[in-house]
UniProtKB/Swiss-Prot annotation:
Residues 54-70 are annotated as: Framework-2. Residues 71-77 are annotated as: Complementarity-determining-2. Disulfide bonds join 41-115. It comes from the Eukaryota. This is Probable non-functional immunoglobulin lambda variable 11-55. It comes from Homo sapiens (Human). GO terms for biological process: adaptive immune response; immune response. InterPro entries: Ig-like_dom, Ig-like_dom_sf, Ig-like_fold, Ig_sub, Ig_V-set, IgV_Light_Chain.
Amino acid sequence: MALTPLLLLLLSHCTGSLSRPVLTQPPSLSASPGATARLPCTLSSDLSVGGKNMFWYQQKLGSSPRLFLYHYSDSDKQLGPGVPSRVSGSKETSSNTAFLLISGLQPEDEADYYCQVYESSAN
């Protein structure tokens, strides 16, 4: 049986307080069912991914975006409602990139994925 590649579209969204970070994602990513997708979101050099709140959203055709993953650190991650445990996140400070990881890809994972960074404006 032939495996059909899944197409995962990546779109970026940015927010911030005083500085406006730029988030960069590739326009699309293809992966085979059962594989692990590693979706990157690279921050501009004026901010460090290490100490930032990263949010990931999933949007399927005809639906509103839904919170998929909140990720601050390895010990502070939270899946959105109904998101399977095969979803996780990681950060790579050397490349200033956050990653959304989806293991055991399934056809229902085909969607648009948005990353967002939140920087608290607390003084």
